[in-house]
Amino acid sequence: MTFKLNLEQLRKQAKERVRERRAAGESARLADVQFELARELGFDSWPRLKSYVERLALEQPFRTDLEYYEGRAYGIASVNGVSIAEARRDLAARHGFGSWRELRRHVGAMQRGQERPTPFVLAYRAVEDGDGERLRELLDRFPDLVVQRGTNGNDLLGMAGNLEIASLLLERGADPNRGNDYGWTKLHQAGYGNDRELAKLMLDAGGRTDLSARGDGGTPLVQALFWGHREVVDLLGSEPGNLRVAAGLGDPGMIRDLVGTPQAGAHREFYRPHGGFPAWQPSDDPQEVLDEALVWAAKAGRDEAIRLLVELGARVDADPYRGTPLTWAAVNGRVDSVRTLVALGADPNQLASFGGPDHGEGVPAIHLAAQAGQREAIVALLDLGADPLIRDQLHGGTALGWARQGCHGELADVLPDPR
């Protein structure tokens, strides 16, 4: 039987069953039938079913580990610039609870099995497990699952981890352009993950390349270019067409057309893909715009763009937001770009920032290349004069220590041990 989880319709279904049974000469009480209906839907009682349905327009808790919700609260606090306490209250309210304590109590009950899993929770688990058969059964029974939202406003499509599950959800009516609380769509995920097959699937389903997430200008293309991805970008358009995009795409003509124009620094409200990166406020300072573009060219290994941007005034030692050009080139294994930047004046031992506030402060490029396991970049940096025994200012580690922290102890054959 297919159920539309609408309270009015559920009440009608219960009353219709009562009428049918009484017409057949059976004894039937509305309360008993409501309980029966609730049990069929996986709930212990009619009041629990009623409470669930009343909250369907809100975000549904679907994870049973409290740490997950703590992490989401931290993200809200970071993005909105509010206290953790305020972020927790906000998160609880999004789920229909009056306080953080109430949300924690509910999640704890889910964890202990005192709250039976709702249809959305069961569907989420099927998505996580890649169980297309089970998900199909749930969608057959509860077609409205495709429009329900979980924590952070993520729907089932947004949480789908493989193409089969994503395809099934699209077939059942999931909106390819529906974003979560931050505007993040599945096409943004394709850009972020450098996933061509997912991008093709979403584009074929009508996915738009011009939608922004986490700030104006945060298009799917920009999510890819933030990390220096190259394989997926030809599918994702060119929006928002500013200098960072031109640099990441390695388009010299576009760079020349943009430098010195307002469009060069336009649509740069987006600057981080998640709250793990610290807050920053991009400005319209032409020098900052140039310097940032050089970083984005280095991320993607666009050597012609690197040389052009330096010629136009970009600084090779600039650290506009969490990383110099050399840092990002090294982390991404862009060996030719590492050599190009040093030839243009970059200091291989410059101390810079990187990643989140607890990741890199006062750290040289070779340490980050070591953590990322980029052997060829490490060899190039050593050849160019990088000192692997410098200790970073935040953790006091050498390049070999960073390699081991990144599970790349095999790099001990090229990095000296300070002991």
Language model features: what each stretch is:
Residues 139-144, 167-175, 201-208, 235-240, ...:
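Ankyrin repeat domain, specifically the short helix-to-loop turn at the C-terminus of the second helix
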Residues 134, 164-165, 197-198, 231-232, ...:
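Conserved ankyrin/ankyrin-like repeat signature
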